[in-house]
């Protein structure tokens, strides 16, 4: 380089960049932190599945086809079971048709 300030044409890069692999071959030993984290996740999953929520269901009476509204409180998996029952052989009857049955 000549002069007080370098210019781009004066800078010559002789080395080409080498690609660096981001995957390393190191393996970490199981630590207590990982075990604690897995236990915490399992506890949270159990608590999440046992949380009760209210669900509003709108269906029709199997006798007169009028709308019937239900509110149930259950867990997520249980509402899926109820959904399967309603699509299957379970029939809901309105209060007017119930005494006639």
From Swiss-Prot:
Highly phosphorylated. The E7 terminal domain is an intrinsically disordered domain, whose flexibility and conformational transitions confer target adaptability to the oncoprotein. It allows adaptation to a variety of protein targets and exposes the PEST degradation sequence that regulates its turnover in the cell. A zinc finger (unnamed) spans 61-97. Homodimer. Homooligomer. Interacts with host RB1; this interaction induces dissociation of RB1-E2F1 complex thereby disrupting RB1 activity. Interacts with host EP300; this interaction represses EP300 transcriptional activity. Interacts with protein E2; this interaction inhibits E7 oncogenic activity. Interacts with host TMEM173/STING; this interaction impairs the ability of TMEM173/STING to sense cytosolic DNA and promote the production of type I interferon (IFN-alpha and IFN-beta). It comes from Human papillomavirus 13. The keyword Zinc-finger applies. It is found in: Host cytoplasm; Host nucleus. A motif (Nuclear export signal) lies at residues 79-87. Its main location: host cell. GO terms for cellular component: host cell cytoplasm; host cell nucleus. This is Protein E7. HAMAP family: PPV_E7 (MF_04004). Belongs to the papillomaviridae E7 protein family. Plays a role in viral genome replication by driving entry of quiescent cells into the cell cycle. Stimulation of progression from G1 to S phase allows the virus to efficiently use the cellular DNA replicating machinery to achieve viral genome replication. E7 protein has both transforming and trans-activating activities. Induces the disassembly of the E2F1 transcription factor from RB1, with subsequent transcriptional activation of E2F1-regulated S-phase genes. Interferes with host histone deacetylation mediated by HDAC1 and HDAC2, leading to transcription activation. InterPro entries: Papilloma_E7. A motif (LXCXE motif) lies at residues 22-26. The keyword Zinc-finger applies. Keywords: Activator, DNA-binding, Early protein, G1/S host cell cycle checkpoint dysregulation by virus, Host cytoplasm, Host nucleus, Host-virus interaction, Inhibition of host innate immune response by virus, Inhibition of host interferon signaling pathway by virus, Interferon antiviral system evasion, Metal-binding, Modulation of host cell cycle by virus, Oncogene, Transcription, Transcription regulation, Viral immunoevasion, Zinc, Zinc-finger. One of its GO terms (molecular function) is protein domain specific binding. Residues 1-40 are annotated as: E7 terminal domain. GO terms for biological process: DNA-templated transcription; symbiont-mediated perturbation of host cell cycle G1/S transition checkpoint; symbiont-mediated suppression of host innate immune response; symbiont-mediated suppression of host type I interferon-mediated signaling pathway. The lineage of its organism: Viruses, Monodnaviria, Shotokuvirae, Cossaviricota, Papovaviricetes. The gene is E7. Pfam families: E7.
